[in-house]
């Protein structure tokens, strides 16, 4: 099942789409500079591109952690990104009242993993009519995503994307079950499935409020996921991850973006040049 996002076709058998950008908006200048690099690289490589960033990280572990620029300022920044680069934008919402204002600016609205079973939020998102990206909760099996999908469909919106972001593996660790991609496709009517490699790299230190990460393994994990024939890749970068205000240890250094995507595209092209082989 394919979904249209402006002039971009998103489907498990179509060339992969990059949902890329920064974890959280820090300021206008850094946002535009980062987006400009993404646009330059993706246009050079012929990769369909959607800019991503959060205006508010409402689920930070510590009350003292940076959350973002807020809804009003965030929407102004997204408007400037769209005006300057002419690309679609995705961002996440956390409360029902945010859905309509965000839908008026952004092309895709994201349901955070921790909030994926909140029915009132699901209903408010569905009512916008926008394309919805559903983050799979760390605590949910791939097959259980069908229940969230059904909520959206009952609320009148079937324009859905499913996003893997890792599963809890004991305490303070995440793993990615590569078989889960196929399970989500099978149980949810072959909706587009994308892979959030960045957040799948997170680790926790029991003594710290900040997330750790394994960015050195980003390419290995991304290639493994994309080998399962996915609709897209979800990726966060930063010009200097050590200075990032959220999830720096999992962010790809921005200067490595082109070499990273060259490898992802080569694999995606190879996988999708072959007919689907069904094994019963």
From Swiss-Prot:
It holds the Pfam family DAHP_synth_1. One of its GO terms (biological process) is keto-3-deoxy-D-manno-octulosonic acid biosynthetic process. One of its GO terms (cellular component) is cytoplasm. Its EC number is 2.5.1.55. Pathway: Carbohydrate biosynthesis; 3-deoxy-D-manno-octulosonate biosynthesis; 3-deoxy-D-manno-octulosonate from D-ribulose 5-phosphate: step 2/3; Bacterial outer membrane biogenesis; lipopolysaccharide biosynthesis. InterPro entries: Aldolase_TIM, DAHP1/KDSA, KDO8P_synthase. It catalyses: D-arabinose 5-phosphate + phosphoenolpyruvate + H2O = 3-deoxy-alpha-D-manno-2-octulosonate-8-phosphate + phosphate. Keywords: Cytoplasm, Lipopolysaccharide biosynthesis, Transferase. Signal peptide: none annotated. It is found in: Cytoplasm. One of its GO terms (molecular function) is 3-deoxy-8-phosphooctulonate synthase activity. Belongs to the KdsA family. This is 2-dehydro-3-deoxyphosphooctonate aldolase. It comes from Neisseria gonorrhoeae (strain ATCC 700825 / FA 1090).
